[in-house]
């Protein structure tokens, strides 16, 4: 594991001061009432396993700008941050209720594409996703 100060963050992710401490942030519209600083919004490592991994210095396979297939998007909190610093982001979720929230999150993100599909059955959504996905989360 790498010390936080040595961590190379994906392009489009920065450390910014929120509530008196340095935390991860992405540029984008607020989704869940998270603290903001101008265009930047806090990415809470206590609410997002992916943010916790990045915060801990683990390699997550995201550099910024890539095409992402995000499996298990739920209501869209973490995937909204991913879409803020990535290219096309396909968010797969099988439960209709969270997908309603996910669709609302996608309204402010032109590169976020919610898919009401079962992630275990890629043949049902492969025709929608770009052929060359750079990362699967």
Predicted segments with their positions:
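Conserved class I S-adenosyl-L-methionine
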Residues: 62-76, 88-90
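Conserved alpha-helix/loop element of class I SAM-dependent methyltransferases that forms part
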Residues: 8-15, 44-67
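Conserved S-adenosyl-L-methionine
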Residues: 82-90, 110
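Signal for well-folded cores of large energy- and translation-related assemblies
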Residues: 55-59, 83, 103, 107
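S-adenosyl-L-methionine
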Residues: 92-137
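N-terminal auxiliary segments of SAM/dcSAM-dependent transferases
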Residues: 1-40
């Amino acid at each position: 594991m790498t010390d936080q100060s040595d961590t190379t963050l994906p392009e489009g992710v920065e450390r910014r001061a929120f509530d008196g401490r340095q935390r991860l942030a992405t540029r984008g519209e607020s989704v869940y009432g998270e603290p903001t600083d101008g265009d930047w919004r806090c990415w809470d490592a206590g609410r997002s396993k992916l943010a916790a991994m990045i915060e801990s210095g683990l390699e997550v396979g995201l550099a910024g700008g890539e095409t992402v297939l995000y499996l298990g998007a739920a209501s869209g909190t973490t995937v909204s941050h991913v879409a803020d610093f990535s290219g096309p982001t396909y968010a797969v979720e099988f439960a209709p209720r969270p997908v309603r929230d996910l669709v609302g999150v996608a309204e402010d993100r032109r590169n976020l594409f919610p898919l009401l599909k079962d992630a275990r059955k890629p043949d049902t959504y492969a025709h929608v996703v770009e052929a060359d996905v750079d990362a699967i989360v």
